[in-house]
Structures are given as C-alpha cells and as structure tokens.
Amino acid sequence: MPTAVLSNQTAFESYTGIDLSMDMPMIAAEWKKRKVSFDGIYTGYLSGVSQVEWVEQFMQEFANPQTKIFVDPVLGDEGVYYRGFGDEMCQAMKKLCGKADVITPNLTEVLFLLGKKADLKAESQNLEQIRSYEKQLSQLGPKTVIITGVSQGEKIWNIGYSAKEDSFFEVSTQKTGEGYSGTGDILTSVICGCMIKGESPQKALKKAAAFLQASIEEAVEDKTDPNEGVAFEHHLSLLFD
C-alpha cells in the first residue's frame, strides 16, 4: 500500500513528496473487491496519527488468523522524534504495536513507547536493561520484540524476545563505517520475509544481520555517501539457504 511518494529520502538537504492518505481507502476498496488477502502485513513510516489509525482499520479488514503482522514503529532516532512527530503520534503507534506479532523499534523508539526519557547514555544501553524493556514492550501485545541497532563499544546488537517462550535471542555484528540510511528498513524487511516463509524469529534475525553487515561492508569499501544507503543487491544470495 503506497502511503506517500518521495523524490528521495528525507536525510538529504531537500526533498519533495506527495502524501497519499486520501488515496489509500480507494486502493483498499479495489483490493477488497478482488478478495485480496495477505500472508503478512508490514508497516514502516506512517505520516501521522490519521494514517496510523487507518492502518489499524486496514489490518482489521485484511488480516486473517494466519496473517503475520509486523510493525516497525517509526518515531525517531538518536534520542529525538522525527520532524512532525510527538507524544500524540507515540500513543497512536503504541496502540498499533498492540496489533502486531512482531515489532522492531530502535532504542529511541523503545524509550518513547515506554514513556521514558530518551537518554541514550551508556547506562540506557546496558543489555540487561534492554532485555527488561523488551519484556515491558511485550505487554503491549506483540509476540516478538526485536530492538535494533544497539551500540555497545565496537559492536552493534540486535536483541530479540519471544513472549511465548519467555526467552531472549540476539545477534551482534562489528560496528562498521558511518550510519547508513535505510539499514533499519532492510533489517526489518528481511526479518519479515523470512518469518512469512516460516523461519523462526531467531533464524530470521541472524540471516538479516549477516545480510546487512555484508551490505554495509561493501558501502564502506566503495566510500558510498551514507545518505545513499547500502549496496544490498549484490548480497541477495545470502537470503537463500
């Protein structure tokens, strides 16, 4: 479902775009006529509260008991909200997380969703503390919580929690290069695809992290502008067993 069309991603010095909020109901109506169904529904950036509320309605209409729902609760990064977002958007996203099977927030988003100050000092990134945050987030409703991109020394950690099994799983990779745009989107997209194929969250996260690491290493070697993202296309074979 297209929610907006952008000329380029928003980290560049300028961009233009078209909000498709008014078109989304018409697209959904056409899909409903054709009895479209989905193995998975995956939400990423949503432009505001009204889009979040509409997506909830979309899930009610199009999800069936077998549909896996993934929510990447895009709210902010580096301790601050993205432009135009605030507490109202956070509350709407919190409600949406309650509809999900899997959520994949970064640490800033975790703290916002839990109503905490977004302090990203070392004590906030203690791995034991993060595991406790995951348990708290699971109480919103998702079966699996994966907190992404946690920086610890020379490592980047992605830490998962299965509410059903009351167990944690995690993958760390070497910190490489600068922060590249779109890496969180790639990680969640691979997790989503793998789990819809029937793979476990643990295997999906491991595969996604390895794929992303290889893509970042190529971007570093090629001296790619971080705003351009990473060259993931050359590494798609890593996603196939």
Predicted regions and their residues:
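Active-site-proximal loop/turn and secondary-structure-junction residues that shape catalytic pockets
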Residues: 47, 75-77, 109, 151, ...
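Short, small-residue alpha-helix embedded
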Residues: 112, 178-201, 205
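Conserved N-terminal subdomain of the carbohydrate kinase-like
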Residues: 1-71, 75-83, 234-237
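A non-catalytic, amphipathic alpha-helix used as a structural packing/dimerization or gating element
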Residues: 23-26, 95, 132, 203-211
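Conserved phosphate/ATP/ADP-binding segment of small-molecule kinases
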Residues: 83-168
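Short pre-catalytic strand/loop immediately N-terminal to key active-site residues, enriched for Gly-Thr
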Residues: 167-181
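Charged C-terminal helix
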Residues: 202-241
